[in-house]
């Protein structure tokens, strides 16, 4: 028997963005009638590869073959013409339209005589495609009346109208109930039986082993291998995903821990945190790891007062505190550096100095209620020198600085308030290697001075490299905690995907 021809074959695909090589000579195969899992840590390159396949990005190098024939994917339309469709985690249905209007959006059927949309034909065809995936939804229903699982069925039916041969599903069960998830699996089985190749992206191990036939793994923008699901287990798959040792690039500093600074008990919020409890000491960096959507940022924003807690208590230095808004957190000495520094951390149209003193203007008010510019300038210059911010002057627009220097300005903004607890979310995202090390040194200095630090990061070597303890979150809950000496990438990944033993 000859070798099977894959439905999809990607060979030597590379893609660079300014300063970053997102994909480096990546290959991928998927077969018709099979579900292929695409696995990798956050930042491994999964999304970039799928955006190239679906026409969102253009590849720099490489080839794409469908059923042995090379195709050139120049955009979303050409991808769809080649039979490639992606169903994003954030569904793109329009709530104010009916089911059939959504299914045929952009591909409406018009009457030959009037030129108007043939609603009857639209409904009939929609019903046919829905029946093909075993779905009984009235084509006339408004999409706003459907649940998330039903909306997902609309997206799948829409893919079938475009004669999709390859369907990419990106974290499809994230917002689904158990019942909706089982329904989706039945639909995937129907699609598989029709000979469609499914590429399934998920961090939920139990799903991968339940519905997938093969797995393809990326790590740090490179292809690390593939395997038949029947030939591997959890441990082997996790080893393929992480597989690297920590280099000596993290200047960890061991300092004596002080008194209890922060205690969180049974904290929950409607944005996705469920009963979180943990402690943090002075002179300690607590790393928080977890996959995208695990609730790490939501936990930080609840402690910071951006999200309102629905239950739980927060204590600072042994005393219960009430945090109902951001100003409550700041007044109690809790500060938060957002993962998105350009949208939430700084004001790009303002100067370095203006950004730095933005949260502390009252300090510079004189008796006439105007700003003491001399005193303000003195503090700005102090922090520019102290944390080595590379800027021509304090008047420079922050948007003109590098990512690392922008991050230092935001850090200086909070340090001016002398916080007790500093929460820093993705501290080195989009920052070059040299600047990363400077940020780590700064965090170590703050730790040595007695600050209590929470560091959220998707970069496992970073978490392992500079944290004193590591807390892992999965689906809104704290799934485990590891001491620095016992933690490694595999033990963190197991907790991140919900494997506790």
From Swiss-Prot:
The keyword Membrane applies. It is found in: Cell membrane. One of its GO terms (cellular component) is plasma membrane. Residues 8-245, 255-500 form the ABC transporter domain. Its EC number is 7.5.2.7. SMART domains: AAA (SM00382). GO terms for molecular function: ABC-type D-ribose transporter activity; ATP binding; ATP hydrolysis activity. Its main location: membrane. It is a peripheral membrane protein. ATP binds at residues 40-47. Keywords: ATP-binding, Cell membrane, Membrane, Nucleotide-binding, Repeat, Sugar transport, Translocase, Transport. InterPro entries: AAA+_ATPase, ABC_carbohydrate_import_ATPase, ABC_transporter-like_ATP-bd, ABC_transporter-like_CS, P-loop_NTPase. It comes from the Bacteria. CDD domains: ABC_Carb_Monos_I, ABC_Carb_Monos_II. It catalyses: D-ribose(out) + ATP + H2O = D-ribose(in) + ADP + phosphate + H(+). Pfam families: ABC_tran. Belongs to the ABC transporter superfamily. Ribose importer (TC 3.A.1.2.1) family. The complex is composed of an ATP-binding protein (RbsA), two transmembrane proteins (RbsC) and a solute-binding protein (RbsB). Part of the ABC transporter complex RbsABC involved in ribose import. Responsible for energy coupling to the transport system. This is Ribose import ATP-binding protein RbsA. It comes from Clostridium perfringens (strain SM101 / Type A). The lineage of its organism: Bacteria, Bacillati, Bacillota, Clostridia, Eubacteriales.
